[in-house]
Amino acid sequence: MGLNIDPADMAHWTILCAERYLSVFYDYLHERIYDYHVLQADETPVLVSKENRTEGSKHYMWVYRTDKMYLDKQIVLYEYQPSRNASHPRAFLKDFKGVCVTDGYQAYHTIEKEREDLRIAGCWSHARRRFDEVVKALPKDRRKSSLAYLALKQIQAIYREENKLASMTIEERLKHCQLTVKPLVDAYFTWIK
């Protein structure tokens, strides 16, 4: 005994439920995300089988979230879009004033140039990953003497200090960042130049 329900019907019900009920909550969270001074944004390709495009073509899931320093009030929003065009984050971030941490994708910098109230900051994880790839590509006997290895060590020192922030209040974090993290970041950028 059982009931056979076509998966397409179940998918359709899910879409209708989201459009009728969850979209109101999504819009509310989208407005609330503007209350934060620091956001993180990223986009990742997703394969789509329909929607008037070639089967298997790339579309994008854009993700916007509050920074991890807002421990008790995390908001993570996903936005499906058919392309990686700058118009998508431009529309999503139109009322946001603050710092948006990204992976360095040029679209974010294009938007930053259009606005005085938006700053784009680079993501340390993305920078670190590039240096790590370089170090791994080098022969083992040359790794520790490479500039990429030195960059990795400096980024690790920054991470070590940032990891201490997790249990602190926002005020304590700010003080700790100014006293320990900022000098490390300044030293890193002085070294890079």
Could you tell me what each predicted segment is?
Residues 1-193:
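Catalytic center-proximal scaffold of phosphoryl-transfer enzymes
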